[in-house]
Amino acid sequence: MMETINAQIIINKIENNEVQWLYNHFSEYFQDVTSINDLEQILSNYNAIRGQNHLYRHLHINRHQEYIWFDNKMTTGVSVFLNKYQEIIGMTLVPIKHIRGMKQSKQYYTIPIKSKCFVYWGGDNELINYHYQYKNQRLAMDLIKVEDGCTYNGDSNQCENYHIYGLPIVAPANGVVEEIVDGISDSIPGEMNTVHPEGNYIVIKHGHKEYSLIAHIKPHSFKIEKGDELLRGQHIANVGNSGNSSEPHIHFQVMNDKNLQVTQTLKIQFHNNIAPVKGDEITYNGDSILIEKEQPFSKIAKNIHTNITHLFKG
């Protein structure tokens, strides 16, 4: 009979350094790539600096679950992934870095899609935003679409089966097309194109010397050209899976320079003053963006953690 594991059980085992119990609940593959001695050291380092943990989100989709905790001092965070067999297939324990002086956009923006979407990566720390560790992507967000608890219907190896694939991408604010890259094929979901990580993308120049980037666009779907003036909400292309993308989604960021290598991202000011983060579902209706917190679902990337992620120094 399958043992039922819940959030309280997991975090209690982590806080009490119950290494053997945790290791016994790893999937077979996770055990193969994880040393029990490393796990013991990681837990010891983590518990030496953490505060009192509180469950932040419980997300589940495609028969996988993710639990996320932060401590009351916001100094540490934990993420644990479970598969449909209640086996642990991923564990992340990180100190929370608080970077000061991050600038906010002066321009107000909408999300670049008019369909309801789900924030898979987004926020101001690396536990809920994978991009945070990279200066030129730090405040970016990734958007997917979930229907009936799934990101796709049918064969997960086909881009066309993902709910967000092919949907219209719209301009997030008025601006001028600064740059377009096109002609890069969509990848098979789960197979990343690391040679062209952004895939097909567009850079739009807005007011206040701000730029937006939308990446992983479907090839040959652009409706506009370099130099065109855009209005907020204008259809500019369609969602694809080009570049370093695990499955069809929208990568969106606002930045202070058009050069993607040296730019710094800005904290996006959205209409309605919302601040979407991982686990939020967003709906865009003209001037309004509605946000729903604590949605009971999330996307599980194909290349899920293959080992314990930790940044604690022993």
Predicted regions, residues:
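Short, glycine/small-residue-enriched coil/turn segments at secondary-structure junctions
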Residues: 130-192
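Acidic, glycine-rich catalytic/binding loops that coordinate metals and/or anionic ligands
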Residues: 196, 223, 228, 253-314
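A structural signal for short beta-strand/turn segments enriched in small hydrophobics and glycine
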Residues: 175-177, 227-239
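Short, low-complexity N-terminal intrinsically disordered segments enriched in polar/charged residues
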Residues: 1-16
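Short histidine-centered loop motifs in beta-beta connectors
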Residues: 210-233
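Short solvent-exposed beta->alpha transition segments
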Residues: 21-60
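Exposed beta-sheet edge and beta->alpha loop/turn motif
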Residues: 59-107
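Zn2+-dependent peptidoglycan hydrolase active-site motif and core
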Residues: 174-218
